[in-house]
Amino acid sequence: MSRVRLVIAQCTVDYIGRLTAHLPSARRLLLFKADGSVSVHADDRAYKPLNWMSPPCWLTEESGGQAPVWVVENKAGEQLRITIEGIEHDSSHELGVDPGLVKDGVEAHLQALLAEHIQLLGEGYTLVRREYMTAIGPVDLLCRDERGGSVAVEIKRRGEIDGVEQLTRYLELLNRDSVLAPVKGVFAAQQIKPQARILATDRGIRCLTLDYDTMRGMDSGEYRLF
């Protein structure tokens, strides 16, 4: 079974990719999750990391310099270079299989309504399956677009960055399946936070704002596609 690794270290962090970013020396929590993701945390940002790398990515160690450098690289060649100045804690843990979040009543109803009226995603769309199971959890809706291409839909009541990250992980996994690939993504929610919309757009994920009242048959506005 895969393990999650927790490291507390004095370190500097450099991101090298589409842009560059530098975090000066400080004590930080380095989180290596079983899904392959790596994130760097401080003590003042709740759950949000200072920097991160989404799976699939690979960790190697460069030990030729004065301090070891942990290099996390993804398939696009982007890197997190973590220079380790000192380690205070390093432990690994098996968390077991997580049952996942249980959708609240509104999200479950949104999923059912969108599955019933799949044309709201676009003309010619057809539903393949609700709760399409993957190795990392169920995709809310798996559909086909008007050209027969695969589309994965993640549905939230409030669309935030963690929802986009969740859909990104599903897409990366589904696109390894030669039967389904290429798979596009749609992030659907009653309200989508600006940061989540920017991240989704940057990753080629389409956003759909849902009007719950309209979907229940009440006249309260139009659907908005962005």
From Swiss-Prot:
It comes from the Bacteria. One of its GO terms (cellular component) is cytoplasm. It holds the Pfam family NucS_N. This is Endonuclease NucS. Keywords: Cytoplasm, DNA-binding, Endonuclease, Hydrolase, Nuclease. Its main location: cytoplasm. Cleaves both 3' and 5' ssDNA extremities of branched DNA structures. GO terms for molecular function: DNA binding; single-stranded DNA endodeoxyribonuclease activity. The lineage of its organism: Bacteria, Bacillati, Actinomycetota, Actinomycetes, Mycobacteriales. NCBIfam families: PRK03298.1. The keyword Hydrolase applies. It is found in: Cytoplasm. Its EC number is 3.1.-.-. Belongs to the NucS endonuclease family.
